[in-house]
């Protein structure tokens, strides 16, 4: 398939790489085997100290489409921005170096974008484990009934609430460039896809979602905590950038109603992101993180950027308890991070009462 007559490739595939020799062959094998042949594969080596650069060079020798940006370590956001500056395909795709794509992934994503004139297309993916035995589980972000048709993604908060998964999508490069959509280049940071994803969903005129699973998202190392002090507040930095972008940049080009809507959406999804980040933290950082979370949401509520009623009942009760007294919440919720569904239900009963638990259970059943 080739849709670009300008001499540039149909798609630029960006692969950020740092010390991932164990998985890199499988990743690059899936990239060069794509049924969409008219692509460039840009490997951004972020100062790897293992054999990753040598593996990239192996593929460069075998396939002229493979290129490398070889640079000192500067973090994920800066690596991605360097790749975006080098890319010259009509579309941009992203592949994490420990994941791998289905052979027809890029062809399906680009074809859907072309048919619908979409600024981006996004698909489902598989959670993948290689040990103790190989298994996969579909991460169904999109139900079949919602797929294959153009949508305006900023119409509903549900779209913003999806897992960012920037790598199960392709984006029109001119859309990203025209809107100056880039990654937050904080050195050593984690969770650097939140602000990128928010801007994409807020600014896209048209998107298309696909039910197909296009990628295997490796889970073998998912159990690791955030143990580095300089990574504790990375998610806060992402949402600070989202807030800055809305109140400064969007205020110049959007109506006051749209700005208010985006602020509300940002705070609703921020709650989910913060709780997910909290669960992954080393426990010694819980108190510090909760104090900042409470301060931020208290400020947002006082500024009328959103209301607690914008959240589902169990989330509303939980956030109110954190905002009211984060240290009391921590003292009474020591097992929250590791709790299963029953443990969470008991927690929500304590902070919100039986009605909140009923809503939580019904939501779980509906899923």
Feature locations, PLM:
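N-proximal low-complexity "stem/linker" segments adjacent to membrane-targeting elements
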Residues: 1-32
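Membrane-interface aromatic/basic loop that binds lipid-linked glycans or pyrophosphate carriers
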Residues: 3, 118, 279-367
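Cell-envelope/extracellular polymer assembly enzymes that use nucleotide-activated donors
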Residues: 9-12, 40, 195
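Short alpha-helix within the catalytic core of nucleotide-sugar-dependent glycosyltransferases
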Residues: 25-29, 53-57, 89, 102-114
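A conserved acidic beta->alpha catalytic loop
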Residues: 45-54, 74
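Donor-binding/catalytic cores of nucleotide-activated saccharide
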Residues: 76, 80, 97-211, 215-233
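Short aromatic/hydrophobic "clamp" motif used to bind/position activated sugar donors
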Residues: 92
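Catalytic core of nucleotide-sugar-dependent glycosyltransferases
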Residues: 212-221, 227-254, 271-303
């Amino acid at each position: 398939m080739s849709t670009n007559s300008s001499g540039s490739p149909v798609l630029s595939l960006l692969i950020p790489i740092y010390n991932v020799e164990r998985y890199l062959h499988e990743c690059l094998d899936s990239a060069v085997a794509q049924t969409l042949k008219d692509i460039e594969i840009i490997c951004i080596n972020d100062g790897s100290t293992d054999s990753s650069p040598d593996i990239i060079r192996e593929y460069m020798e075998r396939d002229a489409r493979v290129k490398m940006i070889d640079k000192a370590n500067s973090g994920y956001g800066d690596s991605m921005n360097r790749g975006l500056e080098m890319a010259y395909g009509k579309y941009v795709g992203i592949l994490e170096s420990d994941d791998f794509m289905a052979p027809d992934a890029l062809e399906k994503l680009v074809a859907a974008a072309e048919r619908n004139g979409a600024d981006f297309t996004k698909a489902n993916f598989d959670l993948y484990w290689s040990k103790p035995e190989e298994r996969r589980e579909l991460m169904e972000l999109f139900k079949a009934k919602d797929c294959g048709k153009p949508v305006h993604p900023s119409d509903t908060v549900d779209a913003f609430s999806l897992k960012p998964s920037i790598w199960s999508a392709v984006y029109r490069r001119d859309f990203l460039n025209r809107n100056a959509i880039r990654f937050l280049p904080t050195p050593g940071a984690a969770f650097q896809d939140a602000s990128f994803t928010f801007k994409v969903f807020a600014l896209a005129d048209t998107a298309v979602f696909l039910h197909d699973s296009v990628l295997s998202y490796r889970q073998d190392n998912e159990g690791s905590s955030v143990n580095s002090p300089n990574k504790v507040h990375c998610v806060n930095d992402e949402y600070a950038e989202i807030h800055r972008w809305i109140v400064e940049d969007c205020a110049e080009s959007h109506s006051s109603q749209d700005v208010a809507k985006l602020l509300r959406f940002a705070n609703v999804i921020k709650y989910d992101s913060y709780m997910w980040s909290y669960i992954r933290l080393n426990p010694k950082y819980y108190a510090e993180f909760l104090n900042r979370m409470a301060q931020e949401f208290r400020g947002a509520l006082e500024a009328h950027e959103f209301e607690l009623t914008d959240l589902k009942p169990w989330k509303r009760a939980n956030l109110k308890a954190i905002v009211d007294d984060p240290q009391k919440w921590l003292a009474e919720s020591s097992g929250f991070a590791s709790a299963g569904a029953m443990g969470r239900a008991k927690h929500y009963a304590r902070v919100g009462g039986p009605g909140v638990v009923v809503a939580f259970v019904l939501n779980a059943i509906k899923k």
